[in-house]
């Protein structure tokens, strides 16, 4: 099953059973105690704890999560990932223990064809809290599990609580047995490599008191309502269902791993350390992509620091495989393509994401180049002296001068068998923070430190001139490189430029920063981003394209006119769509978020159900009516109280000062507080084309539109497609829907006939294969290379047919095929062969090793694959040799 199939099966199953399907919340958690959403339950905590009444009795979701606590384990175990998706089903005082167990067992063991996940009951084990006899009996009654496959464990592993007084309760975990090839018998209590946890059911029923540790606390009594909170790791189930060895090889992650292998010239599976590095790349690129799609930006503090660390570990992993050049331009598109089906926003917002990623990579490549040399020297000197610890001042120098995060220094030291004098490092950091002066040897750490901007902010606020002009003459007030104030920057440098005035708009209010340049005598700076790092100060992140720029140089800020035109069209279009929404849906449909860039706008609004196509069309028509009416756009600055008296709309979550800017479009038709850039009349927007509407939470919807040139281009593409269809199908445009429906029905009929013909063709091949069996010890081996096949399923069907027709004598069937350049070997055994010691999983792994890949399965049926089609013959020989041994 593909990851998307597992996700859909989950949501469909629970949705059909009365659960409200809740879209994933952002990775940026609303919980102030969390940097990220770390578990599927996080968005539901207010309901589970009773702080907020649940708006539904039961719910289900597939939640995006980020955890970096075990970041060093990424790539080294089959199931540690920093980004993962958690399937969850929740009950808020509705059903409880028995029903939760029944749901879990039914979904797991129902066949894929009938909407389940298709696990064999024989492969599943469960654990329960050792005092929870109710859960044990429920498992025996519902699943028919014997006592030996229901293991009772203590509070440390099978009792959930928050770590403080509050809700608590026993839990029951479900495990998949990967077979004896992965570890010893004995169940989950003995081996977590062989027995992989796939689902945890938490029975939240008690109130716990104070205590320390995982198990030292008192149960005070029952909760007023009993809740259910369950979590299934989507990636874990995916790697088990896809027959691969770990989560890095599933369909949503493997494309990045393969691209890393191609770029490095290394072969996955050939070297353990290279394999770990490729997995790190695959995991961290995906995590970085998803974080940036939810608005996180690389920085030196908080969430941004975690993102920066992931990206820098990726760069370093590629360098350790011999790739010194930039690779994000290849890796991030591969991850985008793998994830966009489940999360379209990663594709929609990829221009912004990629600009951030590529700039971050270029900066760190330069950091690595200087810092690695110093660290290598320090490692060599330490070892030459017989030492075991790198000096703290060396680690401090790397951090302070070269921007090396301390965790990276610690990691690189450990790889060389050394430690770092962390105590001395921390002491130097403390001394640095207490010094007022900031000379070259004692610059403050970039971690969570904004003091580098203090001297510039003291000179006054940056004046934004971009409302009135696209080019502004100014002077270079300050330059920042690597978190330090410098006097100059040269070609190739990534720097921040501070100016007393600028025509370039800094990202805010949902509007993306302007594109453009800063030019002067002898230098040309490309603007990568414009931000407000501290209140009142605008910082321009630039790359020096040519020349050398210095503090005090005269300069001109130049806004990309096409970009600004598109951005103003999008922002004014957002105001029109917002006003149209409220006209159609009522005043409760207020804006809860927005994003605007040239040609595109996205508006989130409070609403709890999908919009019908008729409603969408009505909103679009009203907004475009305002465009056609050529409404005048007027901006005014006034006290906030006066603005409110005029009815200007203040948006939820935005913070306003005493003086605000009011944007009127057609007078009261649309009146909002807004600091963004806008057209001067609504007709300049050109056209608003609503292209999407979706859910972004239980009480919010999102409407997406193209505006201006992009809207016309999109309609032109649609018109061309319709024209091509009418020509190809020789059908008038108004009859196209019926004609296409007829063609789809004919296609389904043809596909059924083809499937019947293929089944007959497979049946006809069976006698010839049966006739060519040869004896290997006590077993008859039937093996053949089938050449080109449509898919691995075709090979599997033929293997199964041959085994069924082979009779009761011991028989092993091993057939191989080339499925579009991917070699596949399927091995099957009958009962007599298994009694004689033949195991399909072992034989498939022997073949896969020759093919340069992996394999596995059960004793009766297993699959191996790889990348080397030319080795299929040798792989079949390996099966024969493994069987003979």
Curated annotation (Swiss-Prot):
Cell location: Cytoplasm
Q: Which reaction does it catalyse?
A: tRNA(Ala) + L-alanine + ATP = L-alanyl-tRNA(Ala) + AMP + diphosphate
Q: Entry's Pfam families?
A: DHHA1, tRNA-synt_2c, tRNA_SAD
Q: Which keywords has UniProt assigned to this entry?
A: Aminoacyl-tRNA synthetase, ATP-binding, Cytoplasm, Ligase, Metal-binding, Nucleotide-binding, Protein biosynthesis, RNA-binding, tRNA-binding, Zinc
Q: Which InterPro entries match?
A: aa-tRNA-synth_II/BPL/LPL, Ala-tRNA-lgiase_IIc, Ala-tRNA-ligase_IIc_anticod-bd, Ala-tRNA-synth_IIc_core, Ala-tRNA-synth_IIc_N, Ala-tRNA_ligase, Ala_tRNA_ligase_euk/bac, DHHA1_dom
- Give the binding site residues for Zn(2+): 571, 575, 674, 678
Its Enzyme Commission number? 6.1.1.7
MF terms from GO for this chain are: alanine-tRNA ligase activity; aminoacyl-tRNA deacylase activity; ATP binding; tRNA binding; zinc ion binding
Which cofactor does the UniProt annotation name? Zn(2+)
- UniProt note: domains: Consists of three domains; the N-terminal catalytic domain, the editing domain and the C-terminal C-Ala domain. The editing domain removes incorrectly charged amino acids, while the C-Ala domain, along with tRNA(Ala), serves as a bridge to cooperatively bring together the editing and aminoacylation centers thus stimulating deacylation of misacylated tRNAs.
This chain's protein is named Alanine--tRNA ligase
Its gene is alaS
